[in-house]
Amino acid sequence: MEIKNSPSSLTSPASYNCSQSILPLEHGPIYIPSSYVESRHEYSAMTFYSPAVMNYSVPSSTGNLEGGPVRQTASPNVLWPTSGHLSPLATHCQSSLLYAEPQKSPWCEARSLEHTLPVNRETLKRKLGGSGCASPVTSPSAKRDAHFCAVCSDYASGYHYGVWSCEGCKAFFKRSIQGHNDYICPATNQCTIDKNRRKSCQACRLRKCYEVGMVKCGSRRERCGYRIVRRQRSASEQVHCLNKAKRTSGHTPRVKELLLNSLSPEQLVLTLLEAEPPNVLVSRPSMPFTEASMMMSLTKLADKELVHMIGWAKKIPGFVELSLLDQVRLLESCWMEVLMVGLMWRSIDHPGKLIFAPDLVLDRDEGKCVEGILEIFDMLLATTARFRELKLQHKEYLCVKAMILLNSSMYPLATASQEAESSRKLTHLLNAVTDALVWVISKSGISSQQQSVRLANLLMLLSHVRHISNKGMEHLLSMKCKNVVPVYDLLLEMLNAHTLRGYKSSISGSECCSTEDSKSKEGSQNLQSQ
């Protein structure tokens, strides 16, 4: 029986979800995370942002057909189909960008899924192995397949030389690497490169090309046939394209090392400034403090800071060029020291107080409610006072914190076959950061002898920082064993790694490596079983 006056174009809810899954970007709320943290420094920040690293949130068509947009996560990658043996977090694209990563990492927003994963070193490996932040391809099937040039922010015509780029920047980079042009910036090597001003300075444009990850080996074969017309492509194809580019670029490990060599100490310091994580907020518990409430606040804060610490480490030039195992070991060895030196820097202008967070400021006497923590508070205040006497500058703090990371591991970082290459890379990176610290001190206007004394004083304080971090680690482990406070997520993983490393310290180096490798394999098998 034919029903008249029935609109033939009426779509059922099921078909509506599929056909309307792609909406115009301009109709949805836009979330633009920023990797710049305002701080006290005397140099203008070098911004390496581009729309290629922006996340867009498109209003969902399901459950809200009346027109009101539903807030969605800015990290749609957790919605992608997994590869079978990996978790949704492991499907994040592995971007080669070092400088264009926003602070608000997608996997940080998806942390609610992490409690389903086994807590072991494999979790940290996945966080380091992934981009940890927005990659050039961030649109799932529910968004338009638009990309932007990582250099000038114009619409990208394809995937050229390892990054999404427009025809103009692709041609410019091709001419530059073929013609060996030695460009000179007429200004201060900080020219803004965007769609309208990309032709104003060739030197800064070429520098920007290298900074966003353009490499000579990223040939025209990696274009993936992308056109700027609104042609749909599945997320799996995009991930495959990026993985192919990373495999090709892996054959030229010297490219990123040459980029690090080309950075002056001033540029390296500015890069460390751009990598600084944001301030983390934690709600202050109701007064008065109890042992449980204070430890709960401190552990929650530490877990949040660890998330940002991984993103900070990956933005240090050359760190991601180390093997994944080396990155994991360095972070496992220094995370408490990095947290401690950050606490000291925040507290340097507040004598007698510890600024754990902008909304969590503690006096010395407030630590009396927690057994054993008062001694740690005294050590923190004493070392902070010493930094205050030296009038520690922000740029010196940036270099010192990076040195703590790179000089943290006391154990072999690789197997015998890889040890020489790994040691060379790490030493080269540590020397670059040390040179940057020497350059910062030289700009203070003091004599050469005073510069040497100041450098020695700063480096000697690092032993105090490590001593305090060891005390803090022991105290946190005791609180965990006494069940004073529950420890979850990344903080628990770091504590377990510290305990395992302490157990292995009495074992020979070969046995230690074999035990650790077997532990990593067990973690991988546990992930596959889930």
Swiss-Prot record:
UniProt-listed Gene3D superfamilies: Erythroid Transcription Factor GATA-1, subunit A (3.30.50.10), Retinoid X Receptor (1.10.565.10)
Molecular-function annotations in GO: DNA binding; nuclear estrogen receptor activity; sequence-specific DNA binding; steroid binding; zinc ion binding
UniProt domain NR LBD: residue ranges: 264-498
DNA-binding region: 149-214
Tissues expressed in: Expressed in prostate, ovary, Leydig cells and in epithelium of the efferent ductules and of the initial segment of the epididymis.
GO BP terms in the entry: androgen receptor signaling pathway; brain development; cell population proliferation; cellular response to estradiol stimulus; epithelial cell maturation involved in prostate gland development; epithelial cell proliferation; estrogen receptor signaling pathway; hormone-mediated apoptotic signaling pathway
Segments crossing the lipid bilayer: none
Highest taxon in the source lineage: Eukaryota
Pfam families, per the entry: ERbeta_N (PF12497), Hormone_recep (PF00104), zf-C4 (PF00105)
Entry's induction text: Isoforms 1 and 2 are down-regulated by 17-beta-estradiol.
Keywords: Activator, DNA-binding, Glycoprotein, Lipid-binding, Metal-binding, Nucleus, Phosphoprotein, Receptor, Steroid-binding, Transcription, Transcription regulation, Zinc, Zinc-finger
Annotated localization: Nucleus
Main location: nucleus
Zn-finger region bounds: NR C4-type: 149-169, 185-209
InterPro entries: ER-beta-like_N (IPR021064), ER-beta/gamma (IPR028355), Est_rcpt/est-rel_rcp (IPR024178), NHR-like_dom_sf (IPR035500), Nucl_hrmn_rcpt_lig-bd (IPR000536), Nuclear_hormone_rcpt_NR3 (IPR050200), Nuclear_hrmn_rcpt (IPR001723), Znf_hrmn_rcpt (IPR001628)
Phosphoserine carried by residues: 61, 87, 105
UniProt-annotated glycosylation sites, renumbered to this chain: 61
Residue spans of biased composition, Polar residues class: 506-515
Post-translational modification: Phosphorylation at Ser-87 and Ser-105 recruits NCOA1.
Matches recorded under CDD domains: NR_DBD_ER, NR_LBD_ER
Region (Modulating): 1-148
Domain remark text: Composed of three domains: a modulating N-terminal domain, a DNA-binding domain and a C-terminal ligand-binding domain.
Subunit structure: Binds DNA as a homodimer. Can form a heterodimer with ESR1. Interacts with NCOA1, NCOA3, NCOA5 and NCOA6 coactivators, leading to a strong increase of transcription of target genes. Interacts with UBE1C and AKAP13. Interacts with DNTTIP2. Interacts with CCDC62 in the presence of estradiol/E2; this interaction seems to enhance the transcription of target genes. Interacts with DNAAF4. Interacts with PRMT2. Interacts with CCAR2 (via N-terminus) in a ligand-independent manner. Interacts with RBM39, in the presence of estradiol (E2). Interacts with STUB1/CHIP.
Record-given protein name: Estrogen receptor beta
Species for this entry: Mus musculus (Mouse)
Gene name as annotated: Esr2
